[in-house]
């Protein structure tokens, strides 16, 4: 069955962790796929406000899965919008103050940081290139709007203690230093299901690319799930195909392998 839509994680899939850029081979491959009529979608854990590293292909993008699936949209139309219950947002904010860890609070259009810690700068600013967050922004105005995602900076061990405080939420970790928390049902796989219904295409007509734990649901849901060569082993285990790394033409090579573009 011909592929009609391709879904791409950003960090570690589209964008290299080494160069913080989209490789030229990836840009060219996506341009070629677009010319063949394939719709191009972003599938990221990032909030909309901090998608700041895909300018090279932004003009090619047909729609977005963001906040790990809590908000999915095409143009100005929201396909999914799934906020975290307000009392569970407050529970995490209170816990972060008590245990002294940082939390990025993510609304539909804005983000704010609670309890700034150096680990935030190390990971988000230096490693991920997120340099457009004002750490002095207060979180209270943000808490008056629906919160779609919380990103606490704590270990996997702490996660096992803290996440149960939020019984209606799920955790999707793609970095050892933090995790993304969304409401139950908000994951990339479910977002893909809603998008395909809206577009009138089948899951078998979709290919998805990813490298982190938060990509596993969409790789398992799409007709073809592709893990990058630099992906976690758990991600590779659920993929239909493992391509080369983001820095070694991984997306181009997979497109050629599945006949989406010519060599």
Predicted regions mapped to residue ranges:
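Asp-based phosphoryl-transfer active-site loop
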Residues: 4-19
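Short active-site oxyanion
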Residues: 37-41, 60-62, 147-150, 204-205, ...
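Mg2+-dependent phosphoryl-transfer enzymes with acidic/Ser/Thr/Gly-rich catalytic loops
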Residues: 1-5, 23, 181-263
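Conserved acidic, metal-coordinating active-site core of Asp-based
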Residues: 99-209, 213-218, 230
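Residue-level signal for inorganic ion chemistry
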Residues: 33, 44, 68, 150, ...
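Short, acidic loop-to-helix structural element flanking the phosphoryl-transfer center
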Residues: 19-38, 81-88, 129-131, 186-197, ...
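Short, structured coil segments at secondary-structure junctions
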Residues: 57-60, 68, 165-168, 221-222, ...
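Active-site phosphate-binding/coordination module
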Residues: 21, 25-119
């Amino acid at each position: 069955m011909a592929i009609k839509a391709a879904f791409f994680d950003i960090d570690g899939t589209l964008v290299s962790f080494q160069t913080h850029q989209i490789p030229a081979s990836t840009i060219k491959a996506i341009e070629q796929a677009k010319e063949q009529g394939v719709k191009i979608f972003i599938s990221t854990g990032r909030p909309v406000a901090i998608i700041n590293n895909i300018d090279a292909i932004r003009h090619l993008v047909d729609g977005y899965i963001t906040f790990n699936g809590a908000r999915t949209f095409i143009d100005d139309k929201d396909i999914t919008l799934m906020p975290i219950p307000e009392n569970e947002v407050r529970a995490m904010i209170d816990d972060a103050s008590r245990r002294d860890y940082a939390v990025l609070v993510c609304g539909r259009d804005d983000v704010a940081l609670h309890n700034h810690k150096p680990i935030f700068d190390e990971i988000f600013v230096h490693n991920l290139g997120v340099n457009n967050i004002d750490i002095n922004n207060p979180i209270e105005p943000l808490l008056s709007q629906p919160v779609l995602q919380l990103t606490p900076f704590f270990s996997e061990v702490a996660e096992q203690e803290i996440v149960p405080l939020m019984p209606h939420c799920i955790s999707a970790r793609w970095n050892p230093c933090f995790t993304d928390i969304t409401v139950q049902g908000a994951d990339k796989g479910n977002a893909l299901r809603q998008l395909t219904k809206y577009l009138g295409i089948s899951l078998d007509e979709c290919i998805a690319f990813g490298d982190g734990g938060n990509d596993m649901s969409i790789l398992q849901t799409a007709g073809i799930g592709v893990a990058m060569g630099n992906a976690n082993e758990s991600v590779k285990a659920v993929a239909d195909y493992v391509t080369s790394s983001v820095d070694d033409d991984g997306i181009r090579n997979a497109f050629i392998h599945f006949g989406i573009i010519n060599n």
